[in-house]
Amino acid sequence: MKLSDFDFDLPSELIAQYPSSERDNSDLLIAVTPPIKTKFYNIIDYLKEGDLLVFNNSKVIKAKLNLGKNITINLNQKLSDDNWSAFAKPARKLHVNDEFYFDNHKVIITEKLAMGEIKVKFELNDISVFEFLNKYGEMPLPVYIRRSHSLCHPVATTTGSKTYLNNDWIPWSNHGMTNTQNDNDRYQTVYSQIEGSVAAPTAGLHFTKDILDKLKAEGIQATFLTLHVGAGTFLPVKTENIHEHKMHTEYCSITPDTAEIINKAKQEGKRIIAVGTTTLRTLESSCNNGIVKAGSFKTDIFITPGFKFQTADMLLTNFHFPKSTLFMLICAFAGFKEMHELYKYAIKEAMRFFSYGDATLLCRK
């Protein structure tokens, strides 16, 4: 199939710039004929006793670092305890061995790669990288979230290749994205546990603790796996032949207990509902002859129409970009024609798209 087969017209005003007033107050589109538009807090009406919801419990880290001099980096993947890959903007301003100081902590540019990718090393004093990021980093909101507030950046003093940053913050001269305290809460699922994602597994953002408690009370099970979402999730497909596209790799983990719960539910004929495309990709990557295997691994699975699914019966997901690998995935899962028609309906109904947008519940075709 061609990349253009997965294109559709999306009005820019439907790209959600902020979360809904409450997590569960977003809209939910049930993919039946005709589609049913409801509120997310009604999701329990479309599930039944014995269903198994599989969640991604990865926690978003504050992966965006302002280096001063109008330079930002977004961490991508952990390479070792102190070394990470990242994307820099603008990368042309950075050089190998540049050093950036945050109080008595240091970030060093160790390598420059193609397409703005770099490698960095953290030299920190008695704190972990995650503790450092919690203090100095920002939530890595997607690039399509563009707000009209002024950004802030730390005051920077440069001596040679060394830049010193302190906690006196001044506004950027330009306008663009900004993070708010609300984003620190709302761009994180309520059940997130394991730090490592640089983008949110967004289907889970709609769940509240109250909804999770109600699902449990109705006999609807829940279990958790981990996929650390990388920055590559936002990379566009640039080849017209979609099979020439190279997927990014991401770290996944399924515990023996989770694998046992999923396999038991499948054997008993219970419905498996994947909460998010990250969960579905992890399940399908781990599955062999219909059996989900426990373990930790990296996946670059690319799911397109024609893929034979072995795990989930239903998929809860947000609305995705035209021509994206995730729109290809849902076309594979719930039908190419059906998804184009469903998205036309969603656009007509002015549903909100992407990370802070609305959700849809799909059945496997």
UniProtKB/Swiss-Prot annotation:
Pathway connected to this protein: tRNA modification; tRNA-queuosine biosynthesis
Thylakoid listed as a keyword: no
Catalytic activity annotation: 7-aminomethyl-7-carbaguanosine(34) in tRNA + S-adenosyl-L-methionine = epoxyqueuosine(34) in tRNA + adenine + L-methionine + 2 H(+)
GO molecular function, one term: S-adenosylmethionine:tRNA ribosyltransferase-isomerase activity
Listed EC numbers: 2.4.99.17
Main localization category: cytoplasm
Gene Ontology BP annotations: queuosine biosynthetic process; tRNA wobble guanine modification
Keywords: Cytoplasm, Queuosine biosynthesis, S-adenosyl-L-methionine, Transferase
HAMAP family named in the record: QueA
Name of the protein described by the UniProt record: S-adenosylmethionine:tRNA ribosyltransferase-isomerase
Source organism phylogeny: Bacteria, Pseudomonadati, Pseudomonadota, Alphaproteobacteria, Rickettsiales
